[in-house]
Amino acid sequence: MPVYIRYMRKIFTCIALLLCILQVQAGQSNGLTEYKLDNGLTVMLWEDHDQPDVQGWTVTRAGSIDEPETATGLAHYLEHMLFKGTDRIGTLDWEKERPLYEHVIALYDTLAMTEDPKSREAIQTRINKVSREEALYSATDEFSNLIQSIGGEGLNAFTSYDETCFMNSFPGYQLERWLTLYSDRLIHPVFRSFQAELENVFEEYNMYLDDNSTHVQNFVNGHLYAGHAYARDIIGYPEDLKNPKLRRLIEFYDTWYVPDNMALILVGDFNAEEAKPLIEKTFGRLQAKPLPVRKVYPQTDFSKDERFAAKLGYMPMVEIGYKGVPVGDKDELLLDFVTSLLSNSMQVGLLDKLVLDSKVMYAWASNDSRRDQGRIELGAVPYMDAATQQYHSLPETEELVINEVEKLVKGDIDTALVAAVREEFYQQFDRTMEYPQMKVRLLEHSFVYQQPIEELLQQKEQVAAITLADIQRAAKQYFAAPRKTFEIAEGNPKKNKLPKPKILPLTPPKGESDYYARFDTIPTGHLVPKFINFSDIDQDNFYEGVHVYCTPNTQNHIFSLRLKYGVGTYEIPMLEYATAMMNISGVKGDPGMTSAEFRARLAQLGAKCTYSVTDSYFLVDIEGDEQNLQEIVSLVNLHLLFPNFSSENDVLLNNIKGQEYSMRQMEQKNTDMVADAAMEYMRYGENSAYIRRPTLQDVLELTDTQLESELHRALDYELEIHYAGALPAMEVKSVLYGRLPMAEHARPTQSPIDRPQKPVDKDVVYFLPDATMQQAKVYFLIDGEPYSINDAVRYMAFNEYFGGGFSGLVMNEIREKRSMAYTAYGYFERPPVQGRTTRFVGYVGTQSDKVADAVDVYMSLLDSMPEYPATIENIRTMLRQSVLSNKPTFRKKSERLTSLMRLGYAIDPATLQVRQIQRLRFDDIDAFYRSHVQGKPVAILIIGDPKLIDQKQIKAHYGKITKLSKNKLFSY
């Protein structure tokens, strides 16, 4: 249940971009229905029978903006609590549970009025005692178990500034059960295990604060939205989290979770006419209530230029904020367009050119419109001079950004750029309409911001009508106005570490409510399995080592083309830097093309191209207008064969070197990168990607000719060509043949790479001390057996039982019962090729002072797995739906085919697995556990604060602790 803190700006930007590019084409809005129930609930239905399942959401127009200022975090905490059930769901005996629940509410009232620390601690202890008694009559995991019982997947929720959403996917034949369950959760909810869940919220809080970008965004938002609820974290202030008010939570629910403030959204494979009476029968039961008047916040002061500075970043950056507009303003769409003239996915924006010209390292621009206010945000990271190993100054970087903005203000606007951005908007909508999740997000946005869907679906014409005069008017109005500028220097933010609470875990019995039994009697439809049909993929070979796959696109005019060369950084380490150069380089020749000119030419053709690399593959991804396929492919071919890596004063090459120097300076400060490097070391030893990579000195000594040589070496390898588009396969192949780099006698690929792994042949504990971490990270590793597709269902069944989301043992024992973690998991990885060794990977993210206890609990699950045979029916249902709904989009269909072929499948595995799942018994899971997990050596990796982790307890239980140092994990 993520709270969107770090990525709020990105999410708003993506939604804004989606809304900018909407267009009506035949069939795109077919099956869309919107209406209201008598109680005021909005219903939005969109049939899409190309999908294998249904996306079901409930949306409430209430977020952190609606919280009392003295009780921040309520909206997000309520999101957590709405998974705990009702007076019927999740209770084994409501008559016995109810007085205990009401006692807990009263105790929290007393706690809120108590200031003496000792008295507060005594009340917290009392709350824990009563909560433990209450837990004897509850089953807090019942809601997730019920979702599992209908084959539901992706159970989740999120809270933003303006809304709270709950969602999961499910098979269409289970529609009535899903509607019943999602409506019942809103009738008399019970916020049981309030104290325990608060600890999980704290763990979520800890997780975000270990990322410096969270601190940067909070600092920027705090000033951009000063005096407004948007200025604070969605998760709430720590002082409010420490002083929770259960009654305020109940009041918040009663106030905002009313039908007139909510929407039900269904998108996917269902019949809307059949759904309507079921919706009336279920959601029609919700009682209508009036909505209160929402608080009116004052406008943040933008009357003068202001500057702010802080040492918070992994790297220096400048951010510039202007006053924007709220959602629905007449200029919202125009500002989306204007900011895309500065930065866009085609890399042809004015700020993008600064990156391509190596004047800055990174640059961005976004229009962040929200319900109440909006901001325009620009930013850049200075160029890093590899020769001096110094960043350019922030003032110099700021000046570069402002100079580009001034071009818009003065009307110095390239009409080709405007045309390219317009085309990007149109294409982006066509692409997003391929995904049911994005259709849901469109409907969600329509409801939350009260914008009629009909208007949103007419915005193509509005985009087409934007003129140069409109752009200049908006640029003058918004960019010539006062701004707030932020100079972010490198630094280490202060962290507020919270002590482990003195509470005992909940010990609920394993049981089911009467509701569960009645739920099983609700009628369902009939499962009609639909398997993947690969017969529409045209498979051919240009040469022995050059394989081409063509998949039809019947939805739009945008093709996608992936070139997948069978070599990566494992065999050619310097290919990482050659790939980076490709993304900022031009084309040799007379006259040739600069990087900006190359991308501008692609944009004129309605196309974009990106290069990437993994340890196994060098990838070229091209996307564009079908009618220009030949010209686009020819242009990319020219770039691949004749890239111009040289530049005046080697600024391009120095930019790549500077980026690598900057990254290596940052990596020991970034807890996620440190954890990844430590995990790589535990798994691969000296074969860790962080150890076997080129040294920094080797990178700094690179030449452009060396990188060009490494690139062309990669182009000699075996090649897969994956095309998805509307043109006939024969025509496509005639276009591609001879117009792409392909070797007649290609080097055979060894990919996907199977790196030699460090064996786990004895119990071992690794410890990486890091006193800066807000949240410790604990990993578990067990060697498995050579993988066979004959065992695929057994692997899936064990993974679902042991680590399957909210219903799995790991989350239930560690999060639900003991509140030790926000995130915890455990599963066997599936290798990409049969015969390669599997591995069990487990994880717990928790406060350092909880680590020793968390390790004990996790190890107890590995040593003596609890057995609940009654769960097998849910597991069968879940797995059956999982394999049936695991269908690729048409753009990824041919790559799914090749990956299945590598595993040894000739058809959709679901055709075999559905029958195997039906025969599955709990004894199969138990036998798998005993042969693959129980008694096996376990490697444990702990990363966290050495002052808070109880190393004595860990050593006493698991033996010698091997300490690691960061210097050992990274090569320099």
Where do the model's predicted regions map?
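Hydrophobic, small-residue-rich alpha-helical packing segments that form membrane-like cores
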Residues: 196-198, 214-215, 219, 229-240, ...
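M16 family metallopeptidases and their MPP-like homologs
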Residues: 46, 51-64, 73-74, 91-184, ...
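Positively charged n-region of N-terminal signal peptides that target proteins for export
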Residues: 2-11
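Proteolytic maturation boundary segments
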Residues: 26-45, 271-310, 317, 347, ...
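Sec-dependent N-terminal signal peptides
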Residues: 11-22
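A common structural junction motif
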Residues: 184-192, 283-290, 402-413, 637-647, ...
